[in-house]
């Protein structure tokens, strides 16, 4: 939730109630010490329970990064509680039948093939995908599987280094301490280490909700991707092509 520290006051001052949860394994939420205790499905169930306990109604869902992968499933499974959706630099990756199974196994194979990837190797792999105007889909896929391998095999991920490098930010000392505060040691970062590896584990389920909910969506849906986004931009087409009548904007300098 610390990521949204600059957005929250704006909405509060405008009179809105703002709910920004720390997902299990992150922030002030409880953390499993083993990466094998985490699952994509568990995160969805926890967020659904949060919505029910807070009895959220007529809510606006804003999803960025895992706020799409998890949040869009939450919205799809309890759509009556949400009046509109905003997505930014995220997606809900999906697949059909055998293709979904093959995609998952190919990702797992790529992670195994890459083996442990150092932070310096990851930055080198990301250079073309993030900085080139002409980066290809294969550049993005290669970079992303290396990112999964780096995080999966890490024992103590450099949280601040990841944020500064891939967010193109220069954090203050206070911000660095805040980002590292939830993780006294590497064992508390199991969630961060395994989450990217979990992305292809719900492809068929996600496709089901694309077809049953989002392709029939009749409420406001805003697609607001950054103009400089190089990785998740490939998921923007799903929203453009599968959501009926979405509003589409591009965020400059983001």
What feature does the model see in each segment?
Residues 3, 26-62, 66-247:
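Flexible "cap/lid" subdomain of the alpha/beta-hydrolase fold that forms the substrate-access gate
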């Amino acid at each position: 939730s610390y990521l949204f520290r600059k957005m929250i006051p704006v909405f509060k001052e405008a009179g809105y109630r703002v709910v920004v949860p720390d997902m299990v394994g992150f922030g002030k939420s409880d953390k499993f010490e083993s990466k094998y205790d985490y699952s994509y499905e568990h995160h969805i169930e926890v967020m659904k329970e949060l919505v029910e306990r807070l009895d959220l109604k007529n809510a606006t869902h804003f999803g960025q990064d895992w706020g799409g992968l998890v949040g869009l499933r939450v919205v799809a499974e309890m759509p009556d509680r949400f009046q509109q959706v905003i997505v930014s630099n995220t997606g809900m990756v999906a697949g059909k039948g055998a293709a979904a199974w093959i995609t998952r196994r190919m990702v797992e194979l790529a992670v195994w093939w890459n083996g442990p990837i150092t932070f310096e190797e990851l930055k080198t792999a990301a250079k073309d995908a993030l900085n080139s105007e002409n980066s290809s889909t294969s550049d993005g896929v290669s970079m992303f599987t290396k990112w999964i391998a780096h995080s999966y095999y890490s024992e103590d991920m450099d949280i601040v280094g990841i944020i500064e490098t891939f967010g193109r930010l220069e954090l203050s000392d206070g911000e660095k301490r805040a980002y590292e505060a939830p993780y006294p040691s590497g064992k508390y970062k199991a969630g961060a280490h395994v989450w990217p590896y979990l992305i292809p584990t719900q492809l068929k389920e996600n496709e089901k909700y694309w077809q049953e909910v989002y392709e029939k969506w009749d409420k406001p849906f805003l697609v607001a991707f950054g103009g400089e986004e190089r990785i998740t931009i490939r998921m923007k087409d799903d929203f453009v092509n599968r959501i009926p009548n979405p509003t589409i904007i591009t965020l400059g300098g983001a």
